[in-house]
Amino acid sequence: MEEEYRFLDLREMPELKNAAAAWFHAKWGVPEEAYLACMDSYLNRETELGWYLCLDRDGCIVAGLGVIEHDFHDRKDLSPNICAVYTEPACRGRGIAGRLLNMAVVDLRSKGVTPVYLVTNHIGFYERYGWKFLCMVRSDGEPEPSRMYFHR
């Protein structure tokens, strides 16, 4: 049976860069240029902090995440950070985000990058995938603190 989804590192299909930047922008409102700059740094091997995507059978992006130095919080010592984790609503509940998270952690570990961190307000989701709560952090422009997790 054919796999319903394809999981990939952006370096496997760099031609998706513009579509990926537009997709992440549509989900999070961060300017496309910011995504493009990070993706270019990764594709040009200026950094090993990557971008990971899930495509459906039609080649459409249905989920993704990135890894950046700092994800808009006050603990700049906790780096790098998983960012922009998103799965299209119609594709949720299928373990896609978990596979992407694992893919990123394994890839980073293979490059000697560990631990990795993420900021979220979700409780219970990331723990299922081996993430551990570390502390509360203040996210830029947010009145309430957010949860910081780590994975080794």
Could you say what each language-model-derived stretch is?
Residues 1-18, 152:
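Conserved N-terminal entry element of GNAT/NAT acetyltransferase domains
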Residues 28-57:
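Active-site rim helix/loop that mediates acceptor-substrate recognition in acyltransferases
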Residues 53, 60-70, 81, 86:
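Conserved beta-strand in the GNAT
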Residues 84-87, 93-106:
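Conserved acetyl-CoA-binding loop-helix of GNAT-fold acetyltransferases
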Residues 110-114, 120-145:
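Conserved active-site alpha-helix within GNAT-family acetyltransferase domains
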